[in-house]
């Protein structure tokens, strides 16, 4: 089956001052030739004078073939198909927004393209028709090209009735819902922080236990907190949640409570690693670390037992 393709948005060309995502195809004397990724790879050009605000010493340091770049549209000739672009006029804030919009629009595109493949479409016109009857309906409804469809599809995970108004047959609707659920159902993330908690005063380990218990009490039903000992005085705090921001907030809150409690007892609190979302690789490394410590502790216990047995034998 041939690879189907279609632009991301209803309008065939970007407007002047739109910030768009491009892929650099080649570099010539006049400038860089690029493909506009959101507009079915139509060609555009970044003139050399629009690459940087500074004097250009090396083009390759500014732009490279094969790399994606956020650029702003400065001229569009729809009849001739000329699109002039600028890299130097894009602010860091605009680049961040462009990347976010591109990521969400690409997700919608991937969903609809997979729907087309499952339904065995063979023509680009069929894919474009699917866009017209789904993504572009929501983009137009919410007046936010790229975001409208993404937000509607995300909402459809919990409320598929949002798709009822679309002009889809039963097969199209079923395949679309299945693909939306597969791609957009929220994934739980694990959040971790490493802390040091110690008390060298009279209450010692009891003060540490009390402070850690106070931190555990910050758990909620949807965000349970776990605290594991790595090696005194270092502990790892973790929580698993669908809400990344709230998860970070809950761990920060628990750390503040632990700090307050241990310092009341004249103990010490240090943050070794601020709360962050951890990957499977991080988790595997932590599990390996804990396993190694457990093994080392078991070996120490074994040595103690051996010494006791030797002492008894001598008696």
Curated annotation (Swiss-Prot):
This protein's record includes keyword Mitochondrion: yes
Post-translational modification: Phosphorylation at Ser-49 and Ser-52 stabilizes the eIF-2/GDP/eIF2B complex and prevents GDP/GTP exchange reaction, thus impairing the recycling of eIF-2 between successive rounds of initiation and leading to global inhibition of translation, while concomitantly initiating the preferential translation of integrated stress response (ISR)-specific mRNAs. Substrate for at least 4 kinases: EIF2AK1/HRI, EIF2AK2/PKR, EIF2AK3/PERK and EIF2AK4/GCN2. Phosphorylation on Ser-52 by the EIF2AK4/GCN2 protein kinase occurs in response to amino acid starvation and UV irradiation.
Residues with N6-acetyllysine modification: 141
Regulation: Activity is regulated by phosphorylation at Ser-49 and Ser-52, which stabilizes the eIF2/GDP/eIF2B complex and prevents the eIF2B-mediated exchange of GDP for GTP, thereby preventing the formation of the 43S pre-initiation complex (43S PIC). This results in the global attenuation of 5' cap-dependent protein synthesis and concomitant translation of ISR-specific mRNAs that contain a short upstream open reading frame (uORF) in their 5' UTR, such as ATF4, ATF5, DDIT3/CHOP and PPP1R15A/GADD34.
Statement: the UniProt record of this protein carries the keyword Mitochondrion: yes
Phosphothreonine PTM positions: 279, 281
Broad class of the protein's primary localization: cytoplasm
Annotated SMART domains: S1 (SM00316)
Biased composition range(s): Acidic residues: 299-308
Coiled coil ranges: none
Gene Ontology CC terms, in alphabetical order: cytoplasm; cytoplasmic stress granule; cytosol; eukaryotic 48S preinitiation complex; eukaryotic translation initiation factor 2 complex; glial limiting end-foot; mitochondrion; nucleus
Pfam family membership, one: S1
One of the GO BP terms on file: translational initiation
GO molecular function: ribosome binding; RNA binding; translation initiation factor activity
Subcellular location: Cytoplasm, Stress granule; Cytoplasm, Cytosol; Mitochondrion
Phosphoserine PTM sites in chain numbering: 49, 52, 158
Domain S1 motif: 17-88
PROSITE patterns with a match to the protein in the record: S1 (PS50126)
Region (Disordered): 292-315
Assigned keywords, A-Z: Acetylation, Cytoplasm, Initiation factor, Mitochondrion, Phosphoprotein, Protein biosynthesis, RNA-binding, Translation regulation
General function of this protein: Member of the eIF2 complex that functions in the early steps of protein synthesis by forming a ternary complex with GTP and initiator tRNA. This complex binds to a 40S ribosomal subunit, followed by mRNA binding to form a 43S pre-initiation complex. Junction of the 60S ribosomal subunit to form the 80S initiation complex is preceded by hydrolysis of the GTP bound to eIF2 and release of an eIF2-GDP binary complex. In order for eIF2 to recycle and catalyze another round of initiation, the GDP bound to eIF2 must exchange with GTP by way of a reaction catalyzed by eIF2B.
Subunit structure: Eukaryotic translation initiation factor 2 eIF2 is a heterotrimeric complex composed of an alpha (EIF2S1), a beta (EIF2S2) and a gamma (EIF2S3) chain. eIF2 is member of the 43S pre-initiation complex (43S PIC). eIF2 forms a complex with at least CELF1/CUGBP1, CALR, CALR3, EIF2S1, EIF2S2, HSP90B1 and HSPA5. Interaction with METAP2 protects EIF2S1 from inhibitory phosphorylation. Interacts with ABCF1. Associates with ribosomes. Interacts with DDX3X in an RNA-independent manner.
Family the UniProt entry places it in: Belongs to the eIF-2-alpha family.
PANTHER family attached to this UniProt entry: EUKARYOTIC TRANSLATION INITIATION FACTOR 2 SUBUNIT 1 (PTHR10602:SF0)
Record protein name field: Eukaryotic translation initiation factor 2 subunit 1
Organism: Rattus norvegicus (Rat)
Gene that this polypeptide is encoded by: Eif2s1
